[in-house]
């Protein structure tokens, strides 16, 4: 398994001294007795966009959910190994999962606005986190960052459910930005959107990637190539009982993954020969 930011990679990336935001060390995830993903070790660079690609069932979303402990909410799920965020293993017993989720936000595949006004969707997180500043200012800033302000500034009290699918997804991104995270996780954020809405989300991602660490799971390899700086390729493998589990095959700069990958599996996947 290859990672350009690992200590032993010998990669040109090492000389650039990219700051690491999140590091996994031998991270494995189980659902009951079933091994879902095995021993993933990688370093996610700060203020860059990293894409996770691979066939269905390879563990992309499972690993993504480890980064803000959303797997804790799945009955029977357990994690082995560690996820290091700012020098601390977020799975240590003294770590508050709610604080992890504030600092590491998640945008889901399907837009899921609350059945509240546009304004209250954005203000909800800051309110429950005890935000003491100007809420109006915070709401406007989050909507501007999500490139939605000009479209909704005159209807903030309208239901968020009245927005189009693409607008709802940008609202969900704005809602995440309002809690002032350091990392934004996105699990197939364009899967249910039309091509025009997808393009707007991709343009937004490129803009946000200058200020936030973003990790995106996508089945769309063209999208990964367009928006990401780094790409991790995951695949499945059969254990001795014939049961599939996921693993990371290769992690490198996106240009390298798509143009000259080090692993044959990666080359076959990105060229469309399997998957």
UniProtKB/Swiss-Prot annotation:
Function: Part of the ABC transporter complex PstSACB involved in phosphate import. Responsible for energy coupling to the transport system.
Location in or out of the cell: Cell inner membrane
Record-linked InterPro entries: AAA+_ATPase (IPR003593), ABC_transporter-like_ATP-bd (IPR003439), ABC_transporter-like_CS (IPR017871), P-loop_NTPase (IPR027417), PstB-like (IPR005670)
GO cellular component term of the entry, any: plasma membrane
SUPFAM superfamilies with a match to the protein in the record: P-loop containing nucleoside triphosphate hydrolases
Keywords annotated in UniProt: ATP-binding, Cell inner membrane, Cell membrane, Membrane, Nucleotide-binding, Phosphate transport, Translocase, Transport
Catalytic activity: phosphate(out) + ATP + H2O = ADP + 2 phosphate(in) + H(+)
Family classification: Belongs to the ABC transporter superfamily. Phosphate importer (TC 3.A.1.7) family.
EC number: 7.3.2.1
Any one GO MF annotation of this record: ATP hydrolysis activity
A single BP term in Gene Ontology: phosphate ion transmembrane transport
Top-level taxon of the source organism: Bacteria
NCBIfam families noted in UniProt: 3a0107s01c2
Membrane topology recorded in Swiss-Prot or TrEMBL: Peripheral membrane protein
Segments forming domain ABC transporter: 22-261
Assembly notes: The complex is composed of two ATP-binding proteins (PstB), two transmembrane proteins (PstC and PstA) and a solute-binding protein (PstS).
Binding site for ATP: 54-61
Cross-referenced Pfam families: ABC_tran
Protein name (record): Phosphate import ATP-binding protein PstB 1
């Amino acid at each position: 398994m290859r990672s350009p930011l690992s200590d032993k990679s010998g990669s040109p990336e090492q000389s650039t001294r990219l700051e690491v935001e999140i590091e996994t060390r031998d991270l494995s995830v189980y659902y009951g007795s079933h091994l879902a993903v095995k021993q993933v070790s990688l370093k996610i660079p700060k203020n860059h966009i990293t894409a996770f690609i691979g066939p269905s069932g390879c563990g992309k979303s499972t690993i993504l959910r480890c980064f803000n402990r959303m797997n804790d909410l799945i009955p029977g799920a357990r994690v082995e190994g560690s996820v290091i965020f700012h020098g601390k293993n977020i799975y240590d017993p003294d770590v508050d999962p709610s604080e992890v989720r504030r600092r590491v936000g998640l945008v889901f595949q399907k837009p899921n606005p609350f059945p509240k006004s546009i304004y209250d969707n954005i203000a909800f997180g800051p309110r429950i986190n005890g935000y003491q500043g100007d809420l109006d200012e915070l709401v406007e800033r989050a909507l501007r960052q999500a490139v939605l302000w000009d479209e909704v500034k005159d209807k903030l009290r309208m239901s968020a459910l009245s927005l189009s699918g693409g607008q709802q997804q940008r609202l969900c991104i704005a809602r995440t930005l309002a809690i002032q995270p350091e990392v934004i996780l996105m699990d197939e954020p364009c899967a249910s959107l039309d091509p025009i809405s997808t393009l707007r989300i991709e343009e937004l991602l490129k803009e946000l990637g200058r200020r936030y660490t973003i990790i995106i799971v996508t089945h769309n390899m063209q999208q990964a190539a367009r928006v990401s700086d780094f790409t991790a390729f995951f695949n499945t493998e059969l254990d001795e009982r014939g049961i599939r589990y996921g693993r990371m095959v290769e992690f490198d700069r996106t240009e390298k993954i798509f143009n000259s990958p080090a692993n044959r599996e990666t080359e076959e996947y990105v060229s469309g020969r399997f998957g």
